[in-house]
Amino acid sequence: MTDSSNEHETENPSLPIPDNEIQDLQQEIATLKAELKEKNDKYLMVLAESENARKRMQKERQEMMQYAVENALIDFLVPIESMEKALGFASQMSDEVKNWALGFNMILQQFKQVFEEKGIVEYSSVGQKFNPFLHEAVETEETTKVPEGTIVEEFSKGYKIGERPIRVAKVKVAKAPAPQEKEEVEK
């Protein structure tokens, strides 16, 4: 009978479990839940860092491409300005030269259109207040005709993309005349 009662005890799942064993199991469950939460948090953090790194690399790649395009186009600014100056003199030439100039002017406009499509625009400086972020003062002129710090002449145009200058304008800036010293004549 003892064998059958032992058999009966192992088959009965409703045997009482000691309290300390329940507490140990509950503690183990709590520990496992905490570890799972910690690992899940780390996983989410690594996933977010990975996504941020991907976005950062994509942005850097776009910026590098943009700067490469800008640098390539900047190299065309001087020849384009030279062509503009040369075309300015064409009106004083023969009709044949004027016809050639008309064709070159069309090409020049195509270059300018490409610049505009890439976001590169020239900005006007004459009459504006000198801004060291947009202008390089290569000369000054004493005058009372305009306020001090006003740009009176532009030697080369400035260009920018959006609000960021890619080449500053070279300008002449007005400055107030120096006060004249009175000569003292002693006799």
UniProtKB/Swiss-Prot annotation:
Keyword list, A-Z: Chaperone, Cytoplasm, Stress response
Bias (Basic and acidic residues): 1-11
Protein name: Protein GrpE
Superkingdom, taxonomy of origin: Bacteria
Natural source organism: Chlamydia caviae (strain ATCC VR-813 / DSM 19441 / 03DC25 / GPIC)
Compartments reported by the entry: Cytoplasm
Family: Belongs to the GrpE family.
Entries under SUPFAM superfamilies matching the protein: Coiled-coil domain of nucleotide exchange factor GrpE (SSF58014), Head domain of nucleotide exchange factor GrpE (SSF51064)
InterPro entries the UniProt entry points to: GrpE (IPR000740), GrpE_coiled_coil (IPR013805), GrpE_head (IPR009012)
Alphabetized GO MF terms: adenyl-nucleotide exchange factor activity; protein homodimerization activity; protein-folding chaperone binding; unfolded protein binding
